[in-house]
Amino acid sequence: MSNKGQLLQGPFLNALRKEHVPVSIYLVNGIKLQGNIESFDQYVVLLRNTVTQMVYKHAISTVVPARAVNFRVDDAAEA
């Protein structure tokens, strides 16, 4: 994955985690998962609803927050 991709992903997912924003995660096979982001790393996202699911990032198509989220990306990443 490119460095720019990481610079966007990290702050976005971290804002969702810190603010406990409910999300819908759509997988590449069309399945929709819902919950709150508990944690994440380079390869996986932990999604908590009634149970905690480990979702591999390569299987994720789209992350849709339930509300708007402000997150800051370093100016260097906006090139």
Curated annotation (Swiss-Prot):
InterPro entries: Hfq, LSM_dom_sf, Sm. One of its GO terms (cellular component) is cytosol. GO terms for molecular function: RNA binding. The keyword Nuclease does not apply. The keyword RNA-binding applies. GO terms for biological process: regulation of DNA-templated transcription; regulation of RNA stability; regulation of translation, ncRNA-mediated. Keywords: RNA-binding, Stress response. It comes from the Bacteria. Residues 10-69 form the Sm domain. Homohexamer. NCBIfam families: Hfq, PRK00395.1. RNA chaperone that binds small regulatory RNA (sRNAs) and mRNAs to facilitate mRNA translational regulation in response to envelope stress, environmental stress and changes in metabolite concentrations. Also binds with high specificity to tRNAs. Belongs to the Hfq family. This is RNA-binding protein Hfq. The lineage of its organism: Bacteria, Pseudomonadati, Pseudomonadota, Betaproteobacteria, Burkholderiales.
